[in-house]
């Protein structure tokens, strides 16, 4: 039997940030894809129970609709990865992390960002899980 916590230093961080962004939430778009505000309409790979409203946290991919932005982007259904959330969550080292806003980056279904730059900081959990997002991020917290 493996020692307790043997794989904690390899690969993706085992931290599961608090799921604080429910269906219906509005998110700021932090890239230059053309969208400004999106509304969450679903969470990819969420398996709830008993009619529970799906919710997402940092690093999760969501399905959303564009509410504000360029005319060609508005009313489109897109996929996005959450990179910041207001609700604080705890990392394994005891540090608690929270951001000023709830923000996401629009991506393709494979996880490749549609924009070429990201405004503001990106949570380390999202940058580790989605490497292409981490590569274009200017600040990783």
UniProtKB/Swiss-Prot annotation:
GO cellular component, one term: cytosolic large ribosomal subunit
Gene Ontology annotations of biological process type: translation
Species this chain originates from: Pyrococcus horikoshii (strain ATCC 700860 / DSM 12428 / JCM 9974 / NBRC 100139 / OT-3)
SUPFAM superfamilies given in the database record: Ribosomal protein L14 (SSF50193)
GO MF, any single term: structural constituent of ribosome
Coiled-coil positions: none
Presence of keyword Lipid metabolism: no
Phylogenetic placement of the source organism: Archaea, Methanobacteriati, Methanobacteriota, Thermococci, Thermococcales
Annotated keywords: Ribonucleoprotein, Ribosomal protein, RNA-binding, rRNA-binding
InterPro entries documented for this protein: Ribosomal_uL14, Ribosomal_uL14_arc, Ribosomal_uL14_CS, Ribosomal_uL14_sf
Function: Binds to 23S rRNA. Forms part of two intersubunit bridges in the 70S ribosome.
This protein's record includes keyword rRNA-binding: yes
Membership in a protein family: Belongs to the universal ribosomal protein uL14 family.
Quaternary structure and interacting proteins, as annotated: Part of the 50S ribosomal subunit. Forms a cluster with proteins L3 and L24e, part of which may contact the 16S rRNA in 2 intersubunit bridges.
Domain of life: Archaea
Protein's gene: rpl14
SMART domains, per the entry: Ribosomal_L14
Annotated protein name in UniProt: Large ribosomal subunit protein uL14
UniProt-listed CDD domains: Ribosomal_uL14 (cd00337)
């Amino acid at each position: 039997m493996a020692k307790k916590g043997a794989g904690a230093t390899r690969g993706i961080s085992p931290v599961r940030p608090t799921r604080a962004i429910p269906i219906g939430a509005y998110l700021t778009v932090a890239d230059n894809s053309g969208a400004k505000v999106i509304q969450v309409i679903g969470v990819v790979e969420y398996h709830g129970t008993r009619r529970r409203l799906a919710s997402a946290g940092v690093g999760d991919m969501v399905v959303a609709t564009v509410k504000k932005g360029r005319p060609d982007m508005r009313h489109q259904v897109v996929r996005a990865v959450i990179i910041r959330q207001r609700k604080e969550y705890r990392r394994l080292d005891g540090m608690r992390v929270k951001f000023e806003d709830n923000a996401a980056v629009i991506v393709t279904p494979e996880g490749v960002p549609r924009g070429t730059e990201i405004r503001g900081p990106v949570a380390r959990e999202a940058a580790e899980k989605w490497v292409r997002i981490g590569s274009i991020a200017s600040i990783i917290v």
